[in-house]
């Protein structure tokens, strides 16, 4: 039975993979480590690595794996001539792997003459086509090669897909677009990259690698096949480029998405040679396919991952390293296990009490991707809070109408505030941040110098005594609650600086609208942490979200079920511009921020409960 082929590739949302025979993006350190480990690691070696899953991947470029020598099993990497020649001479051949170059012009003796063959390294082979390379592997390396990885270029990728031999795709999703002149071919399932793939198809290279079908392998193009993700990592970033890693598995379009239970897949990780058939191929199981990646990434809580639920977010993704899965799994948990109750709005909720999420800020920014988050609204509202502004009309005039329904004449009257003008939220949020305890008159009054400026005090403590355990800011003022249009939902935050001068923020939220509000709140306090870190000369580290009454409105359930079917994409990066000008928290403007690499799924309509 023919060995399957796995494709390893890094690409932009529009499937760009190269330009001028090189990479379009700057050096991505973790991607290089990922490529090395995936293509070097055999199933046996992965199973021996610290009982499968080390807590941290190695800090150096060394894989820590034994070099395959003659008599030991190893993996093969197959590449086109241009890919081979694009690698610096000192890095070729790729060590600890059998290298096969597909070319009609190169000769094995020419490659061998480049430099002496290292001890234990297999000699580089040259074949005229991908089918010829696969035949060579089957005939001469049947008992020594474990897995076959095609690593470029575009023509070989297209040949593997057309031949129907590609069982798994190892994709690095580069979230930013770069100018490209070479593109990965379109494939069923490429919406994992973006909402609509629009890249023009690059012509296949002149080398004879593209074959629409291959009678000698008995394989024809399978129009009923698609690729779906079984692994999504957390987001990494290097040189201002956010990216993550996904593994896609070949499936028939008619297959039930929940056929492969996560518990079965994870239990098979302890098997060293387990394989399952994929369309007539001897393909690795889902677990075996992701084993090389699992071998260097942090382990998620296995019991949580294996738990069977009535509703589950993208259940075919077995390894859920992307931090957005916290949010998606929270939605599913509430719908499955929450209590249905009445609420103030009259809509009704399904709720749980006491939930937590953690989001890293040192690599990327947690702007959720399974639906588009209103970034302008997040930014403008936070700046509004920081100014201590209580006039919601100022937001509405900028197109941010998130407060409009809570400051109408009817709503203010229902709060026993008939004396308030439309748009006046009262002494809430930003007023308490900057003027805690001051007597509130109306949204037009200048409160400079009145009350306690909590935000200023926190920043001063971070600058002068960063180990202080009293760096808190609260919007909850019991004496003023009846004067507010809405009592604050997110009401307390605390800051912490570690010994590496990294800043983290904890926020406690008493009332959490998971469908509409929580994605906004995650982004808002993450952004606040970035801003405070900048003016205090610290590095952002983590945002921790503590949630009290955590609920899904009953009229959001169907929309959220749609969201649970969407795979997360890489988180973006948020850059602060004009850094030299910004010395104090009040110096920030909306023009000082740049979001890089945000490629979310489309919007999902949900009505706000008032």
UniProtKB/Swiss-Prot annotation:
One of its GO terms (biological process) is dTMP biosynthetic process. Residues 256-282 are annotated as: Disordered. Keywords: Methyltransferase, Multifunctional enzyme, NADP, Nucleotide biosynthesis, One-carbon metabolism, Oxidoreductase, Transferase. Pathway: Cofactor biosynthesis; tetrahydrofolate biosynthesis; 5,6,7,8-tetrahydrofolate from 7,8-dihydrofolate: step 1/1. Its EC number is 1.5.1.3, 2.1.1.45. NADP(+) binds at residues 10, 16-22, 81-83, 102-105, 152-159. It catalyses: (6S)-5,6,7,8-tetrahydrofolate + NADP(+) = 7,8-dihydrofolate + NADPH + H(+); dUMP + (6R)-5,10-methylene-5,6,7,8-tetrahydrofolate = 7,8-dihydrofolate + dTMP. GO terms for molecular function: dihydrofolate reductase activity; thymidylate synthase activity. DUMP binds at residues 344, 490, 509-513, 521, 551-553. Residues 322-610 are annotated as: Thymidylate synthase. Substrate binds at residues 8, 31, 157, 172. GO terms for cellular component: cytosol; mitochondrion. It holds the Pfam family DHFR_1. CDD domains: DHFR, TS_Pyrimidine_HMase. The active site is at 489. Residues 261-275 have a biased composition (Polar residues). Residues 4-250 form the DHFR domain. It comes from the Eukaryota. HAMAP family: Thymidy_synth_bact (MF_00008). Bifunctional enzyme. Involved in de novo dTMP biosynthesis. Key enzyme in folate metabolism. Catalyzes an essential reaction for de novo glycine and purine synthesis, DNA precursor synthesis, and for the conversion of dUMP to dTMP. In the N-terminal section; belongs to the dihydrofolate reductase family. PANTHER family: THYMIDYLATE SYNTHASE (PTHR11548:SF2), THYMIDYLATE SYNTHASE 1 (PTHR11548). This is Bifunctional dihydrofolate reductase-thymidylate synthase. It comes from Toxoplasma gondii.
